[in-house]
Amino acid sequence: MTPTHPAPQREGERGSLHLESTASGITLITGADHAEVLERALRLRADGGIPLIGDERWSPQRRAQILERAAAASPEEGIGWAACTSGSTGTPKILLRTPASWEIAYPGLDRLIARAAGWSTTAGRTLLLPVHPVSSMGPFAAVHAAHSGMRLRVPRGVRITAEDLAGADLLHGTPWHLREVLDLLDAQGAFSHRLRVAVIGGDRVDPALRAEAERRGIAVLGYYGAAELSLVAVDDGSGLRAFPGVRLRVRRGVLWVRTEQAARQLIGGASTLRREESEDGVWLSVGDRVRLSEDGVLTLCGREDQAILTAGATVTPEAVEAVLLASPLVDRALVYGAPHPRLGQLVAACIQPSSAASELSERRLRRKLRAWCARRLDPAQRPRRWLFTAALPRTPSGKPRRLRPAEVADLPPWTPS
């Protein structure tokens, strides 16, 4: 049975909607009104189309790259959704998946939510979705609301307001969004709310954040997943365990997953998703390092690719470095995650400028590199902190050596000639 798609609740208009169809059948949808974007994507899917939600903040060059990738795609039979993801070279990639790969997760997720909230069902509840819809978390949650008979509410601005929160029963977002909600409740004093569950992905939930939410009567379901794999494991406060229907295996410290939620195709380059077939089925890995206890509790130990988690987005350092190194003003570049109390990490860039930058001041160089990145990278990928050094250390193979933030701070400063 095809679920109906009620229009998401909007608190105000935020701009016009842009739809661009491609020869492959994929339609790019962008707009500043995220409720309208999600509503149109759901309608397009119900009509048999393949929605690809974009970012209204993209530069014209970035938008053209995405459209070129989408037009060149050859979607397999049954593909119903497309989502943008960042490649390791800085070029955009598009994930294609079947509707069933998301829908198979919703009954298990509904049971977890209902149990955490003390409800008999999630139907009829209102889901607050503050995530930018360019993230696959956005359309995943919007389809979830439609599939399970929930009302969808999308904030009208970048920040969550008391008006957005009023009447919301559950939140689907990142730790950053949960922090916003708790700060809002603190600021509003006696403000009454009915939020009972926060479904949180994109980064780990800090124990202190979970405890603060629970004191407010908000149960937290933190989950670990990946754009390629969807939901992998969930933590209701007792530890991160396999999501219903998902099997986990650890080999040489790396997590492998057996799941029916996996994306079907990747357009725009080689996939970083590893695939192995065995007697008990197909196992997939995105290279996350983990520990798995005897009683099934999963502990995340980082990514093999040193991925940066910032405000719920996953950024591969190599993707940003590739764009920086293409600038004539850059000789070497090192991108890393700088700790941030609210966002988890900030994308930071340590640059060894080339001789072409010798006559620029540090301020002008930073401004030029920011403009360079704005035309070529998604907003989440763009460096927010900049450091310029006279010498970036190299590995024996000649690549910049991966450094800890404390080591970066000790590098010799760059001074223009």
Question: Each PLM stretch: what is its role?
Answer:
Residues 26, 32-33, 70-84, 116-127:
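Conserved pre-ATP/AMP-binding loop-to-beta segment of ANL
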Residues 31-35, 52-63, 130, 150-168, ...:
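ATP-dependent adenylate-forming carboxylate-activation enzymes
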Residues 79-96:
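Conserved adenylation A10 loop of the ANL superfamily
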Residues 97-115, 126-181, 221:
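AMP-binding/adenylate-forming
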Residues 183-238, 247-249:
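Gly/Ser/Thr-rich phosphate-binding loop
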Residues 242, 251-282, 303, 313-315:
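Conserved ATP/PPi-binding loop(s) of AMP-dependent carboxylate-activating enzymes
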Residues 281-282, 287-381:
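AMP-binding/adenylate-forming catalytic core of the ANL superfamily
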Residues 375-399:
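AMP-binding/adenylate-forming catalytic domain of the ANL superfamily
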